[in-house]
């Protein structure tokens, strides 16, 4: 279906898109092989293997489970031949105070994920969203400086997720700022 419509790449959310995979913990090696084979035969690159988790949750147990899920997905990335495992920084809308309070938690999560990615030569990609912990170009710059690993940490850029009504009049400066900070660490663009 994708190839017939002119597509050569996709972001894959296995539990949502593939029957027989109800979650990230019950995936078999045979299923991963079947996925890799099907995409390769169709000539479709899996640009991002989705594993969207709440990586900045203030509840330590929830956040640790989220980090573990992403780290597990990094192994799946290798098995299915995906370029990245991707997530957003949160799973809910946050106030400005909550965003500030959860940025150190997100940074800790990303550092642990990227450490694991480096160990197995995988790559994690984070998607900024304005209403989540990581939603401004300044916070992205700070996070990228803290992580400092261009081989194992990239960015999924969805312009709709970061543009607010207040930013509309200043788009001439807004978009170049995002592109400058993302730089060569772009995993993909959501259109």
Please provide the spans of the model-predicted regions.
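Catalytic domains of carbohydrate-active enzymes, especially glycoside hydrolases
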Residues: 1-17, 80-83
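Structured loop/turn residues at beta-strand edges in well-structured enzyme cores
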Residues: 5, 44, 80, 151, ...
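Short, flexible/disordered intra-domain loops and linkers
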Residues: 18-26, 165-173
């Amino acid at each position: 279906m994708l190839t017939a419509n002119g597509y050569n790449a996709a972001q894959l959310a296995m539990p949502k898109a593939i029957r027989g995979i109800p979650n990230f913990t019950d995936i078999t090696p045979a299923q991963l092989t079947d996925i890799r084979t099907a995409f390769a035969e169709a000539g479709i690159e899996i640009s991002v293997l989705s594993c969207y988790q709440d990586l900045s949750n203030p509840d330590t147990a929830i956040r640790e489970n989220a980090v573990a899920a992403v780290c597990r997905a990094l192994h799946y990335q290798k098995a299915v031949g995906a370029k990245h495992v991707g997530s957003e920084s949160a799973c809910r809308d946050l106030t400005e105070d909550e965003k500030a309070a959860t940025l150190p938690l997100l940074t800790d999560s990303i550092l642990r994920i990227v450490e694991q990615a480096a160990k197995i030569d995988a790559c994690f990609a984070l998607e900024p969203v304005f209403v989540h912990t990581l939603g401004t170009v300044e916070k992205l710059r700070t996070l990228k400086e803290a992580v400092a690993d261009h081989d194992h940490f990239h960015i999924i850029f969805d312009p709709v997720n970061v543009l607010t009504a207040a930013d509309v009049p200043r788009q001439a400066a807004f978009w170049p700022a995002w592109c400058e900070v993302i730089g060569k660490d772009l995993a993909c663009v959501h259109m």
